[in-house]
Amino acid sequence: MRNLILVGPMGAGKSTIGRLLAKELRLPFKDSDKEIELRTGANIPWIFDKEGEPGFRDREQAMIAELCAFDGVVLATGGGAVMRDANRKALHEGGRVVYLHASVEQQVGRTSRDRNRPLLRTANPEKTLRDLLAIRDPLYREIADLVVETDERPPRMVVLDILDRLAQLPPR
């Protein structure tokens, strides 16, 4: 396995589960959003405010291309990374892709106190999450080698499920 790449919506657990997977597999963990913040010295909301979503997505595309060129990392992506064809291609070719699926209700519960999510700065974050999932779910599934439910499951159980199911996949 080159890399293990986690995709899914905000609040699905990509960063939490990614760190646990990296520890279990003894691999480095990378979070594309955190890497963008480290590189720019600015947080994601600031980048959205100054450059708009297209400016952020340009940075994200460059970062995903760079991180997918690594060999032997666990990578957590931002929820919208799958919106660009180039990103989906890089992610699919960069390693095994696991789609961490979470219901909108779980996403709301997990993101409600997080002010670091520019797309949720709306009057109705639940509707925003529902609309985003309707658009992005088919794109996550398009590139996923595995789809794993995270609702009402402790992160450790999700990690064990992923490792067990990865071991059963044929080489590609």
UniProtKB/Swiss-Prot annotation:
Protein name (Swiss-Prot/TrEMBL): Shikimate kinase
Sequence positions that bind ATP: 11-16, 117, 153
CDD domains: SK
Gene Ontology CC terms, in alphabetical order: cytosol
Binding-site positions, substrate: 33, 57, 79, 136
Documented EC number(s): 2.7.1.71
Presence of keyword Zinc: no
Alphabetized InterPro entries for the sequence: P-loop_NTPase, Shikimate/glucono_kinase, Shikimate_kinase/TSH1, Shikimate_kinase_CS
Binding, Mg(2+): 15
Gene Ontology terms: biological process: amino acid biosynthetic process; aromatic amino acid family biosynthetic process; chorismate biosynthetic process
Function as written in the Swiss-Prot or TrEMBL entry: Catalyzes the specific phosphorylation of the 3-hydroxyl group of shikimic acid using ATP as a cosubstrate.
Cofactors required: Mg(2+)
Source organism phylogeny: Bacteria, Pseudomonadati, Pseudomonadota, Gammaproteobacteria, Pseudomonadales
Main subcellular location of this protein, as a coarse class: cytoplasm
UniProt organism field: Pseudomonas fluorescens (strain Pf0-1)
Subunit structure as annotated in this protein's UniProt entry: Monomer.
Keyword Transferase appears in the UniProt entry: yes
Subcellular compartments: Cytoplasm
Keywords attached to this entry: Amino-acid biosynthesis, Aromatic amino acid biosynthesis, ATP-binding, Cytoplasm, Kinase, Magnesium, Metal-binding, Nucleotide-binding, Transferase
